[in-house]
């Protein structure tokens, strides 16, 4: 057996509370880009009475039809997954053989490299510029005959910047499969899905975890060419979207206006945090189009800042032993959480 470095997710609130010596109800989770408002009551109500004793539809017909209306793409260009993570894994299974190459651009979402390691692929991470933009010469220079797929997030997690269309086109023109992860699309309002008509090697990945507040139900989806989606449908687990997840997505799409109002509120809280940080000495941030900010601390280490926030019950995301070891990613919260965060920041910087 081969030892694979584990991808570590976030701890539950009970574990965070134990580490901080506080009550679980006092934990403020700003470490996973979760939606602090949770699911709409109407979405939760939609789960009641579902036929949980039955297997879900392996063809995902209701789900894909509703998604088709939402994204403006034909049903045969859409597939649902048990979170975006499953679709990343399916793309690896479909395109990558052991020893072949997967390309990403660090710093970015760690699931791409984790899935590549599981596929026994070689992962190449091209460096970004000092403003976290894609370095196209570095990216294209890393592509060779063994390169099978490129993963780029837009907005990028954790830096928050967008993938420019001209950069996406430059990579797509190489002929290599490009997966653009638009998990935070509802916060940025920016998409490259209009390029799908021009490039059959483009895949758009999205999620309901962040904007819809149902991360615990694990539902994501991909948009691509009809041929590519057909192949993904062929290799997925037959019942990968559970009954509860499907019901929640259908209800979320029906009541999307209310959910999008919540996303706008979270963007406003991010902007409020930006304004406060602008006036703080010793901390700066990188402009973000997501529901989070990547903050850099100058007068103390990121570990010290993390510990200081944790003493206030606020948990954020660390990146030790990476190029971001001096930074923390802070998720947008409710107005009350933002106020507590600002108070804590002013006490630790």
Where are these regions (language model features)?
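Phosphate-binding glycine-rich loop
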Residues: 56, 60-101, 299
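PLP-dependent aminotransferase-like
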Residues: 94-152
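Active-site phosphate-binding strand-loop segment of PLP-dependent enzymes
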Residues: 130-186
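PLP-dependent aminotransferase class I/II
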Residues: 40, 201-279, 284-286
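N-terminal "arm"/small-domain region of PLP-dependent enzymes with the aminotransferase-like
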Residues: 1-54
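PLP-dependent enzyme catalytic core of the Aspartate aminotransferase-like
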Residues: 311-312, 317, 321-349
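Conserved PLP-binding catalytic core of the aspartate aminotransferase-like
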Residues: 266-267, 280-312, 328
